[in-house]
Amino acid sequence: MPNLPSEFIEQTRQLMGEAECNALCRALQADEPVSIRTNTGKNAPAPPQAHPVPWTDNGFYLNRRPAFTFDPLFHAGFYYVQEAASMFIAQAVRRYVNRPVVMLDLCAAPGGKSTLVRNCLPQGSLLVANEVMRARSQVLAENLIKWGNPEVIVTNNDPADFSRLEERFDVILTDVPCSGEGMFRKDDRAISEWSSEGVELCWKRQRRIVADIWPCLKQGGILIYSTCTFNREENEDNVAWIASTLGAEVLPVDTETEWGITGNLTGEDFPVYRFLPHHTSGEGLFVAVLRKKPDSEAGNFCFTGENTRREEADGCHAGNGGEWFADGISPSGDSEEEKPASVYSRRTIAETVYTDAAERRGRKAEGFRKGGKGKAMQKGSKVSGVSFPKETEAWIQHAGNFSFRIEDTLAIAIPADYAGFYDELKESLRILHAGITLAELKGKDWMPSHTLAMSTVLCKDAFPQTDLTLAQALSYLRREAIILDSSVPKGYVLVTYRHVPLGFVKNLGNRANNLYPQEWRIRSGYTPEELHPVYENLLELAACSAGSAACPNPLPDSPSA
């Protein structure tokens, strides 16, 4: 690990004092703990021999780091690999959200906090998860599809693109790009790319982001502001700015003393929550919760106007920063041994994170309304002469709660309560995923979608099923050809691992065509000798995945499960 920057050490000493600074620096040189969060929507139980994360119901510390890439349950969305401090966001949501809401996760990739809040939002809530960077928005969509909750929309937009959605969100989470000091021990590049100039760039950009999105928050709505850095400029100073300039009230969150959370370090009289690695078992995190006062004026924003935005973009001299996936691996399965070339995080100060807003606005009308390039959903497009395949409605539970439609060559199901809002979003945003993609038209055949296989409302009995061995499951996840038992019927078959759905194949008898998404496949042909899977000693997993009372160590019921 490289030496910590001397400027960072000095600013930290001034903020925390000599003893705390020294303790923090020692902690940043130590190994980080390994933690996961289980998916209550898929009835995932507590892992055996794991230790609970105290500030969330379904987070657990593991005794050792499994080879997550080679665990089929990881790819099935049965759990998410997430550092423990980040799970505190759920505590804030539970404290202030007790009815169905519309929530925006503005800077959401790779999706850890989105999957977290989706499981603790009340049933009937809608989550809009957004990421500005194109490549990272695809990662976000992948993780949320695997998580399986249908009350989710994924978008790929700059915060300024939400300007038409005035006062439409009850809750907004802004896990803003930052200087990444809290990630120093996870990635050496965070250290080598840190600078005091970068810190200044970040706090200015963070204010621009909050100012852009503030009009979208309802009167009385909740803004959750978070960073993964330690300095006061990006944390307490920005919270004070939001309160004074935008007319916000800073709110408390319930905590326990034994959790080791640190409060405000600047002496100001408002509650904030700092996770410092020498006091809490996790990475660095800062959280503040603010309420938009009813009838408050928007204020004179410091970061509006096209000239200011251009100057901000031109001021990104360092080009530093990166994006760490919280789990150290990409969702497509690149392992610690084979990291992808671009494993950088929204939290740092890469120049590309928030490009010139004027340019984006110019593209929005033409590009975003058309759905843009790639995999964005097309606005109202239909295949001529093709009607909705009614048989697909039987593929999901509670079909009466959904609005069914054809878009391009896809049959999709949108939660009925939010169908109108979805149509409104398509007018101004680039939507990558919404609801459930049930099937795709291939010739004259409606092929069941992988999104359907991952969904928590999949009706498994609508398809023949076959449970794969570990070797077969890894072959399937590598998108290799597999051969099923002769007793398995021909046609579309749902393949499972330990009775948890992995996806579909089309069984031809002599072989099965692998329908796993090409871009999500495990690229590594290497399989470690020791995998140490999360659930290796839990033989009753089949009962858990079916929601049986026989499931050992069940988790508390989730309101959105």
Regions found by a protein language model. Name each.
Residues 269-306:
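Core SAM-dependent methyltransferase catalytic element
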Residues 135, 170-212, 224, 228-235, ...:
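Mobile active-site "lid"/loop adjacent to the S-adenosyl-L-methionine
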